[in-house]
Amino acid sequence: MAETQVRNFNINFGPQHPAAHGVLRLVLELDGEVVERVDPHIGLLHRGTEKLMEAKTYLQAVPYLDRLDYVAPMNQEHAYALAVERLLDIEVPKRGQLIRVLYSEIGRILNHLLNVTTQAMDVGALTPPLWGFEEREKLMVFYERACGARMHAAYFRPGGVHQDLPDQLIEDIGKWIDPFFTTLKNLDDLITPNRIFKQRNVDIGVVKLEDAWAWGFSGVMVRGSGAAWDLRKSQPYECYSEMEFDIPVGKNGDCYDRYLIRMEEMRQSARIMRQCVDLLLGKERVGPVSNTDHKIVPPKRGEMKCSMEALIHHFKLYTEGYHVPAGEVYAAVEAPKGEFGVYLVSDGSNKPYRCKLRAPGFAHLQAMDFLCRGHMLADVSAILGSLDIVFGEVDR
């Protein structure tokens, strides 16, 4: 009897698939139900952000950063602001640093809540997202009360932050922290010991530490494999060196470890937030929130009403913008998804010559083939969920 030629089966996963997290298209080659090859097709959300930033002044480029990882927008602005501040060689006052750290940690919790609960939803649990989004809604209100926008904040500006926070808002953030631990415990009790969740995540998508470094992973992807690498500790920026917090580290490098790390990181973020709130209501209650050099940071409205110089500064800042000394700088922050870096090249004019964005999700997505090979088709969505990918930053 003649042998029949067995051909592998090709299917498209996405870009309309609910588990594809945005506009991802995966071309999967299957042998029965075993994944032989994964080919991610990206670029469906490409907007040419890096090129557009070259035609804008340094201040006008800030809103582009919000639209990258739009789940935790302020963390991206943070890296850009740090890069511009290094080129300008200016310092942010202590109160401004604390506000930045506070809102960066709010962004981290926003991101991890979305990821952990949708990861549970990807494998069939429908309750966690409802609980998670309830907390995210409260945090979105804190975003809104700080800068007027729920998502695209443009709140971190080079030199500091846009406006000071009212005491009432800081108190409300402080009141939110303790009940949040209860919510986390409820989520923990619901998902962590769940038999089905464990079966879908334990020993799935295992990454050894040397592989993680070789693929250019950062953030949770590296910590899940056993390295305590966190830019907030290893290369501290702002006032992170004064904060007390721990870095959770995994042992097995699988999807389940990465989930556990994200859960613990939310607790650590809440700890950092508590320290920031105490300082902002205590020792650092009064003080400037941005650099006082009016050649870079616009003067206050009150000054503009009675000072001609202030009005001229304001006009120059919002028409021409400030000129940044020629040079190049790389600034990175520990964004919720990993190391988000901004490589900024200045030619001495009022617009960036080149701004390269290093998105953590980009490096993680390229390893999809390496991670999924040999797994079942159903595991693809579990692995994708644990990578924590948002397409704004992958395609930019």
Curated annotation (Swiss-Prot):
Keyword entries, A-Z: Cell inner membrane, Cell membrane, Membrane, NAD, Quinone, Translocase, Transport, Ubiquinone
Compartments, record wording: Cell inner membrane
An annotated Gene Ontology molecular function: NAD binding
Residues forming coiled coils: none
GO cellular component, one term: plasma membrane
Primary location recorded for the protein, binned into one broad class: membrane
One Pfam family linked to the record: Complex1_49kDa
Keyword Zinc carried by entry: no
Keyword Membrane: yes
Catalytic reaction list: a quinone + NADH + 5 H(+)(in) = a quinol + NAD(+) + 4 H(+)(out)
Membrane topology per record: Peripheral membrane protein
InterPro entries: NADH_Q_OxRdtase_suD, NADH_UbQ_OxRdtase_49kDa_CS, NDH1_su_D/H, NiFe-Hase_large
Enzyme Commission identifier(s): 7.1.1.-
Family to which this protein belongs: Belongs to the complex I 49 kDa subunit family.
Subunit field text: NDH-1 is composed of 14 different subunits. Subunits NuoB, C, D, E, F, and G constitute the peripheral sector of the complex.
Known role: NDH-1 shuttles electrons from NADH, via FMN and iron-sulfur (Fe-S) centers, to quinones in the respiratory chain. The immediate electron acceptor for the enzyme in this species is believed to be ubiquinone. Couples the redox reaction to proton translocation (for every two electrons transferred, four hydrogen ions are translocated across the cytoplasmic membrane), and thus conserves the redox energy in a proton gradient.
Protein's UniProt name: NADH-quinone oxidoreductase subunit D
Organism of this sequence: Brucella suis biovar 1 (strain 1330)
UniProt gene name: nuoD
